[in-house]
């Protein structure tokens, strides 16, 4: 079964969200949106952009966000690979940028250096972060477990997210 069919099935079954990469062919995005409309918008959709090689400069990140926003979706997701701690600051800087444009965003970094962005993103106004259920089931490098995230938020005194 191809990803298009899996996304359509997710919509039919009432998934809360589906995630589609910004580089997906327009006609496939159109098919997915039609499926969402057919099911009365029960499912919301995320337009995502992943950069596995690194984190571009601020201006390039903002252009990427704007391009994803033009595609549509309920949430824009920008994920890059952090090679240095400063990369986290650039990606997290998209959160106020998105807020100023009236858009919901998920902005975080992958990799060992990106772990802090996964914790900080929701605290700074991102829609959410991602965590694995247990060690060894991570969907991206640097992803913490749900238990680790809960412990960090408890230690920070922010409560569970």
What is each stretch, according to the model?
Residues 22-161:
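Catalytic alpha/beta core domains of metabolic enzymes, predominantly
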Residues 14-15, 73:
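Short, well-ordered alpha-helix to beta-strand connector turns
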């Amino acid at each position: 079964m191809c990803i298009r069919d899996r996304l359509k099935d997710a919509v039919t079954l009432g998934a809360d969200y589906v995630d589609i990469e910004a580089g997906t062919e327009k006609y496939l995005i159109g098919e997915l949106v039609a499926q969402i409309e057919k099911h009365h918008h029960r499912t919301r959709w995320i337009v995502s952009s992943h950069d596995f090689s690194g984190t571009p400069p601020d201006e390039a990140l903002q252009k990427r966000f704007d391009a994803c926003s033009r595609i549509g979706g309920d949430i824009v997701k920008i994920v890059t690979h952090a090679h240095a701690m400063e990369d986290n600051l650039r990606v997290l800087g998209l959160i106020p940028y998105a807020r100023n444009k009236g858009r919901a965003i998920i902005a975080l970094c992958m990799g060992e250096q990106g772990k802090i962005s996964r914790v900080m993103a929701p605290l700074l106004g991102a829609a959410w972060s991602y965590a694995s259920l247990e060690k060894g089931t991570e969907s991206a490098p640097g992803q913490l477990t749900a238990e680790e995230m809960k412990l960090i938020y408890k230690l920070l005194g922010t409560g569970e997210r």
